[in-house]
Amino acid sequence: MKHFLSLALCFSSINAVAVTVPHKSGGTGSPEGSLQFLSLRASAPIGSAISRNNWAVTCDSAQSGNECNKAIDGNKDTFWHTFYGANGDPKPPHTYTIDMKTTQNVNGLSMLPRQDGNQNGWIGRHEVYLSSDGTNWGSPVASGSWFADSTTKYSNFETRPARYVRLVAVTEANGQPWTSIAEINVFQASSYTAPQPGLGRWGPTIDLPIVPAAAAIEPTSGRVLMWSSYRNDAFGGSPGGITLTSSWDPSTGIVSDRTVTVTKHDMFCPGISMDGNGQIVVTGGNDAKKTSLYDSSSDSWIPGPDMQVARGYQSSATMSDGRVFTIGGSWSGGVFEKNGEVYSPSSKTWTSLPNAKVNPMLTADKQGLYRSDNHAWLFGWKKGSVFQAGPSTAMNWYYTSGSGDVKSAGKRQSNRGVAPDAMCGNAVMYDAVKGKILTFGGSPDYQDSDATTNAHIITLGEPGTSPNTVFASNGLYFARTFHTSVVLPDGSTFITGGQRRGIPFEDSTPVFTPEIYVPEQDTFYKQNPNSIVRVYHSISLLLPDGRVFNGGGGLCGDCTTNHFDAQIFTPNYLYNSNGNLATRPKITRTSTQSVKVGGRITISTDSSITKASLIRYGTATHTVNTDQRRIPLTLTNNGGNSYSFQVPSDSGVALPGYWMLFVMNSAGVPSVASTIRVTQ
């Protein structure tokens, strides 16, 4: 497999060129804070570049003629470079420290690599620190890896007052000992508001070499696997057969990269499901008939069988028998009615279901079938059935035996009337035992359409019966479309990002304030806002440590709305009343790591617990995460800190695959999850 660097060189002819702001007369230009060389391929922080007039900069090493101040002289043709010579080159990490002389509300940093055609010193892994005194730096506000090319790099992060900024180059992109920077800028927000206690916290930022338009949690490692398309910043004009991926390891903070060619599949805009064996099944998209399989245990991509129908923007869902159902997807592969089909992990084949008609689930989108069969809200349920909760007003039951079938489940309505279509809204099964699904947001049309605050609770019964549907609370605080969400261990649903009016590849009308829905109280609660726009092509996933991974947006090539990063949201249940991280309960032992549906598991913990839940490992793209669902567990205390519980006996509730087991104490603080595989 090719490394990103070689792929960047292959695509150099189509990469965007940095824009140069003309210098004033006099040659070297002004060192003031206006961004000198703004890339068209990444989103800058919201705010303005800080004047560099009075800055003092220091670096750990410098070559004569390439001193520290060359990175703030306003001239893209000069650069700071660490020492090199016959006596040996100092190895990274290398540090570049800025004293701005006054305290600023800092929310980002930009770094322009050297522009002379030489790659020496390009920064790979890096960390960004802030300090008020130049001595106490704390933990990084941003870290990760930048894509290896010459365009401007950004680190966007939550606003903090600071006087000092430090960029640490942990590695060089090509494994060399040097670091070089042509220009560096620091950004300021217009104001700063300290996070309110009790509403969770954002940060740190994880810088990525790609725009993560799709992602999954690797169940055997806990790493976040992400991918974009054949390019790190765009999907259009794909030659096919190539996907750029990245992985972030929460335990080390390291971002790694891989270019996948073995499956000959550009996996942009796919359907994604974790099958009953735990493999991640990625279907269609830019290569509209292809299937790729990711095996977490071997960290390998495997070619899968072609689908019967070419698809893009379809959804898929794992069923009670571990097979995967998919339907729709007219974004690519032709515009026509794309009925259902099923993938069998055992036979590695796709089978058409000609009577599982797509027509009943179409929205009335003004762009027609090209959009109206996109992103279905699908839930594998009992007896091999699949429930379609939206985004169309119409709900349906799909059946997957023989030639398939479909039966109306009525409309998504309440005492407030029939809900409109909610394309690019969200649907989350927060209590699979009771069949509870929360739906919220979206808009009548895919794009150029105002979002809604509508929210509903759908309660499923037996397949084929009409579900009960009621309005949830008073709806969302904020109208949203292109937002994302995850179910949390305590049964609440975290909702973030989105736009008030859906316009793909624009960061207009963003919603920065997330919400949490608490079902016991039937109430939505505002949380602390973030400062990075997350709209079209953003993703969210629940991490095994109970935090939320939220990233991406854009993937539009030569635009200013590409978000090469992610953030971590820490829910309030991980803090104590003093605002410090709470002491977590720990699972010290599980009687098994694999259990059949209906089986019992005994666990030991280091302290008393009161609740437990299973949450299926998630996959996410284009507002869809059909894999996540939560099972609240009934605990039996065996004495001391030993507990047991039974997994539901219906595989339509406890879908086969990998699950996260969380336990919670009386304060509601969750443990780090243990991974449990549920089998049939």
UniProtKB/Swiss-Prot annotation:
Cystine residue pairs: C59-C68, C556-C559
Required co-factors: Cu(2+)
Cofactor note: Binds 1 Cu(2+) ion per subunit.
EC number(s) recorded for this UniProt protein: 1.1.3.9
Highest taxon listed in the record's lineage: Eukaryota
Pfam families: F5_F8_type_C, GO-like_E_set, Kelch_1
One GO cellular component term: extracellular region
A GO MF label: metal ion binding
CDD domains for this protein: E_set_GO_C, FA58C
UniProt-annotated binding residues for Cu cation: Y313, Y536, H537, H622
Propeptide cleavage-removed residue intervals: 25-41
First and last residue of the signal peptide: 1-24
Repeat region (Kelch), residues: 223-268, 279-321, 323-372, 436-490, 492-544
Record PTM text: Galactose oxidase contains a protein-derived free radical cofactor. In the active state, Tyr-313, which is cross-linked to Cys-269 via a thioether bond, is oxidized to a radical and acts with Cu(2+) as a two-electron acceptor in the oxidation reaction. The cross-link is believed to modulate the redox potential of the tyrosyl radical, which is further stabilized by a stacking interaction with Trp-331 in the active site. The post-translational formation of the cross-link is closely linked to the propeptide cleavage event, and both are copper-dependent, autocatalytic processes.
Active site: Y536
SMART domains: FA58C, Kelch
Ranges for domain F5/8 type C: 42-189
Biological role: Catalyzes the sterospecific oxidation of primary alcohols to the corresponding aldehydes. The biologically relevant substrate of the enzyme is not known as the enzyme exhibits broad substrate specificity from small alcohols through sugars to oligo- and polysaccharides.
Subunit-structure text: Monomer.
Stated name of the protein: Galactose oxidase
Organism: Gibberella zeae (strain ATCC MYA-4620 / CBS 123657 / FGSC 9075 / NRRL 31084 / PH-1)
Gene that this sequence comes from: GAOA
